[in-house]
Amino acid sequence: TSGNTNHLTPSNLTATDVTTDTPTNNFATFNSLHKASNVTLSEANCKAAIAGAGQSRSVTATIAVSKGKWYWETKYTTDVVSAFFGLVSADIAWNINATDYPSSGVSDNVGFNDGGTKYVNGSSSSYGSGFGNNDIIGVAANLDDDEVVFYVNGTAQNSGTAISKTFSGTYFFVVQHQSGSGTSNFEINFGNPSFAISSGNADANGYG
């Protein structure tokens, strides 16, 4: 729909393929510049397919954050490999376009994988019950108070106890095919999702 009545007729689009995007509030997507070579993006970069070949491969979001409180979701649509969700520092994100660069075992990160393991600055420990095929993983990151909570289908992991992580600088959201020879598929929701959900939120301008 055009403000100047120069409307276009949609073809081969579902209802979830049509959303409102405005100059006052652009939504993040997967970043074609911060991805491994075997990451394939589609649906306006809201979907990522990562072919593992037994190695760790990653892709980040387009918009970085350095303060504030943020929430986003990812639908994980493959349960044949190990996957990781979290945040990595900008310095690490710029290296993700390498052929094989992990985001889970690095020095400035925080994340959660399908086995219920949390990662903080490269160190891992048990956290939550993990996730599987078609689960929706939510990430609530509070960079002001240095806390992160991960959700699986709306349920906070580790009884809602936040992961403590000191944030210093700028961070990107990241998903990673952590191990296995299959393909991991991710669908992102930064407010403009490629998948339908039963509930939703909007910003102060009514978008989202």
Q: Where are each of the predicted segments found?
A:
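PRY/SPRY (B30.2) beta-sandwich protein-interaction domains
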Residues: 1-208
